């Protein structure tokens, strides 16, 4: 239940964070996430935001990286979403990326008790379409056979 609370809190935080100023992603576990800049979040109890969350990612990413090459992208985007200077809001992965991650990791997510959480998370992410194409991103290694990309 703790992770459900944190994901909900994080979604609210991201909604109010601006990417007017980005900072480098310093969490080593996120080095394969497909981006290097994240939004500048406020400190948590006087500690840098990324320092607070790096330990959680250090646990979850190794658990899931063996089942999907998109594990880092999905998990890191929850805590340190992609940022681009001058862009109003952080970027999040498109729904197809999350759905592919869940499909590839369904067994591991089920055993960890996280399948429902990530299935719901994927449903909340934007589809790529003319209205939302600039609200989500695909990692460079994403190949979607249904779209040819």
What positions do the PLM features span?
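A positional/structural detector of protein chain ends, strongest at the extreme C-terminus
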Residues: 1-3, 148-149
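Mature extracellular/luminal domains of secreted and GPI-anchored eukaryotic proteins, especially small
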Residues: 18-149
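Cleavable N-terminal signal peptides of Sec/SRP-targeted secreted and luminal proteins
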Residues: 3-19
């Amino acid at each position: 239940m703790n992770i459900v609370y944190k994901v909900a809190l994080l979604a609210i935080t991201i909604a109010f964070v601006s990417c007017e100023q980005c900072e480098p992603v310093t969490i080593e576990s996120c080095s394969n996430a497909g981006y290097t800049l994240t939004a500048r979040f406020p400190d948590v109890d006087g500690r840098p935001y990324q320092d607070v969350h790096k330990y959680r990612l250090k646990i979850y990413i190794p658990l899931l990286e063996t089942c999907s090459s998109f594990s880092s992208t999905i998990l890191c985007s929850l805590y340190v979403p992609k940022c681009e200077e001058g862009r109003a809001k952080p970027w999040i992965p498109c729904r197809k990326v999350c759905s592919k991650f869940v499909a590839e990791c369904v067994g591991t997510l089920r055993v960890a008790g996280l399948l429902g959480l990530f299935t719901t998370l994927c449903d909340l992410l934007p589809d790529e379409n003319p209205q939302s194409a600039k609200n989500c991103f695909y990692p460079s290694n994403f190949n979607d056979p249904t779209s040819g990309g």
